[in-house]
Amino acid sequence: VNKKSRYYFSLDENIKQKIDLNKIYSNYQNFYGTKLNINQDEFIEKIKEIQKKINLDDKIKNINEGVGFPFIIPKLSSADIGSNIKNIFLPALKKSYKNKFQNYEFINHIKFDLSNKLDIRKESRYENIISKSLNEEIVGILYPCLNEYSFPAAHEVLKNLPEKFVLSGGYEIISALIGTPEMLFDKDKYTPLLWFSSMKNFDDENISYHIEPYGYNITLNERAHLNQAAEYWWHSLSILE
C-alpha cells in the first residue's frame, strides 16, 4: 500500500449524487440484451436492504461513507469468465458508454479471444459469484475503496471482512459501469484504473485485467502487476445481497 498519497487520482467528487437506481436499472434493461427476472422495484429494494444491513454493522458501516455503485449481474449459462466478459458484459458496456457520452467510447485493447484465459485468484471468494451467477441474477454494490493497494494488500483486507464481501472482478466492475457509465468520468481530474482484483491470467499469476480511463474514453487491457502498488491502481470490494 502507498502510505503517502498525493490523491492525484480520484473519482468525481459529485459522483455519489449522480447514482440513480432507476437509471441504472433502465441501462441494464436496454443494454444487456437479455430479459431480467428481477424487476425495477425489486432491484431498488435489494440495494436499499444491502445498504441498511451495512449501516447496522459497526464493523463495516464506514464503507458507506465512500461511494458504492449498485450492479446486477445477469444469470449466466457458462462459468467461463472470459467468454462471459467478451460476449455479454463488454457489448453492453460499449452501448451504455456511447449512449451516455456520444463523443467518447469504450475501447477493448485486448485483441486475443478472452475465452478460457481468465481464472479466479485464490482466496478472493469469487467462486461465490461464479456459482451463484449460473442459477440466478446477482444484485450487489461495488466499492472502489482500496486506493493504491497491491494485490497482496487487497487480499489481506478481505481476510478481515465478513463472508458477504468478495474481491471485485470483471463481472461487477463492468456491470457497475454499464449501470453508471460516468463512474470513471471526470473532466477536471484523473480517475483511477480499476483492477479485476479477484482475477488473473489463466497461466500467469502476475498478469491481470483492468478497466482504465484514457482521456474521456474507457478501455479494457491487461498488464503485469508484480504484486506492486501504484498511485493510479485501485482495487475494489463487492458486497452481495
For each feature predicted by the language model, list its residue ranges.
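A binding-site-centric feature that preferentially detects glycan-recognition modules on secreted/surface proteins
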Residues: V1-V166, E172-E241
